[in-house]
């Protein structure tokens, strides 16, 4: 759970887990008592309605069946006159933990526990989890350890070139349900990825679902994602997702506070990479805006995590990768972000090739197989040209995005569960292509 207060309103977020301790159920309805004037800001894994002080959540088509011993979860962010009191909820008409299965079966069953559904409010871990024991070094961080930058190349603890290949989330606060262990484990074990990028929007046009609109809730969600990656022994990119405002220096003080918090929390974890400004735009120049901003933020991180890799965005939505060539940052273990969308940016490849040839450390922290809007048609031929070049050069990359939003760049079809173990039918054309590429290259 998380909570915050803004504009005289209380707010928070919950993830509720229903575990079936009895016979299989094929549908469920949960009811939660809520305070007055409760409004849902976002919700996932259920069909939600509010009447008076009761919020009703019914199953989606994909998560109605809960087998014995299995669990499902749903969640929501809200604003209200008061905070929601934590506690048990009702499931299928009965208080969770008593007899919330099929009532006729319950009445005829001598074992009162046979149809119990227990619902609990799930809280994130209070402390950072320990990295898993892996004496054979079979998972990414145990095998490759603290990464660094040498001669323009990302290298592992042994000084050997190492390429990160993975997925970026969409905005964490819009799709919080995808921040879960099963999803990330599927990316690691089935998609053959070694990194997850956590995109935390800073100030997305004033809708409140971003860091500036909900600092504590956004930070808690991001930390949940980082903790999961540490548990899974994966690398993770903490992305200060500057899209609005275009000039990252607008929120320099907030960025300092944020990176002080997260770099202190994760100081001893080689898993964590920091991306300090996603896509500067709107006239923000390298020497006039971005570099001076970076020179204020990098020392904050270095104080706590002196050896961490830091990615710095470049002008025009991280397309002008050449700008740092003549005016680089004077810090070790710094890389420069380049972003492309295959159906739009084919003309940028020669510039990238020139920068790499001159030894600029390039990290493709975001790319899409479609056009720059996130929509339109996929251009897999152009995507293959880009990724083949990156693989040859050992340049790391993350695909946008791991979510089920109804747009071309999503890897999951609308309505697909966030809980991993996805089948081929769950994937969009982009998802099928990306999974195949990551598994076979």
Can you say where each PLM-predicted feature lies in the sequence?
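N-terminal carbohydrate-binding accessory modules
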Residues: 122-195, 212, 432, 436
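Residues at or immediately flanking beta-strands
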Residues: 29, 195, 235-237, 271-273, ...
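Acidic/histidine-rich helix-loop elements
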Residues: 162-183, 202-216, 372-375, 419-424
